[in-house]
């Protein structure tokens, strides 16, 4: 760019006028606003929300304590302790997720070989205190039990893409 071109761009404020033209173009377009608590937008089938632990049909928890989800978690939000049962299978004694650390990346769900840990489509949850967002095994199993039909339907719909 020559010095003369630079002078004219600076003197006539062409960059500023381009920005104002862009702003003016969107000023008169129809606005899209959602009044959130009353109105809701559709959620993607692959939305990653609140975690849940699933059970088999016979009521036994699916988690085999392989600890892959704990190893793959980039935020170190998952803590697992396990013990070996009499039939030489492992089961978790402690499975905790700290949602204040979790970045909802979905790696835990992808790494699970038995589809035990899943991320549901629940997005409306809160905590009054920091400790309210620390989910224990019992809390995660309760979420899984309550929303098992929705979780199974979402897994079935996503099966061709896995």
UniProtKB/Swiss-Prot annotation:
GO MF term (any one): quinone binding
The protein's Enzyme Commission number: 7.1.1.-
Its membrane topology: Peripheral membrane protein
Record's keyword annotation contains tRNA processing: no
Binding residue positions for [4Fe-4S] cluster 2: 73, 102, 105, 108
Keyword presence, ATP-binding: no
Reaction equation(s) it catalyzes: a quinone + NADH + 5 H(+)(in) = a quinol + NAD(+) + 4 H(+)(out)
Binding-site positions, [4Fe-4S] cluster 1: 63, 66, 69, 112
Signal peptide (from-to): none
Class of the enzyme per the UniProt entry, highest EC level: translocase
4Fe-4S ferredoxin-type domain boundaries: 54-83, 93-122
SUPFAM superfamilies for the chain: 4Fe-4S ferredoxins
GO cellular component terms listed in the entry, alphabetical order: plasma membrane
Compartment list: Cell inner membrane
Protein origin, superkingdom: Bacteria
Keywords: 4Fe-4S, Cell inner membrane, Cell membrane, Iron, Iron-sulfur, Membrane, Metal-binding, NAD, Quinone, Repeat, Translocase, Ubiquinone
Cofactor: [4Fe-4S] cluster
Record text on cofactor binding: Binds 2 [4Fe-4S] clusters per subunit.
GO biological process: aerobic respiration
Subunit structure: NDH-1 is composed of 14 different subunits. Subunits NuoA, H, J, K, L, M, N constitute the membrane sector of the complex.
Family: Belongs to the complex I 23 kDa subunit family.
Its biological purpose: NDH-1 shuttles electrons from NADH, via FMN and iron-sulfur (Fe-S) centers, to quinones in the respiratory chain. The immediate electron acceptor for the enzyme in this species is believed to be ubiquinone. Couples the redox reaction to proton translocation (for every two electrons transferred, four hydrogen ions are translocated across the cytoplasmic membrane), and thus conserves the redox energy in a proton gradient.
PANTHER family per the UniProt record, alphabetical: NADH DEHYDROGENASE [UBIQUINONE] IRON-SULFUR PROTEIN 8, MITOCHONDRIAL (PTHR10849:SF20), NADH DEHYDROGENASE UBIQUINONE IRON-SULFUR PROTEIN 8, MITOCHONDRIAL (PTHR10849)
Name used for this protein in its record: NADH-quinone oxidoreductase subunit I
Highest classification ranks of the organism: Bacteria, Pseudomonadati, Pseudomonadota, Betaproteobacteria, Burkholderiales
Gene that this sequence comes from: nuoI
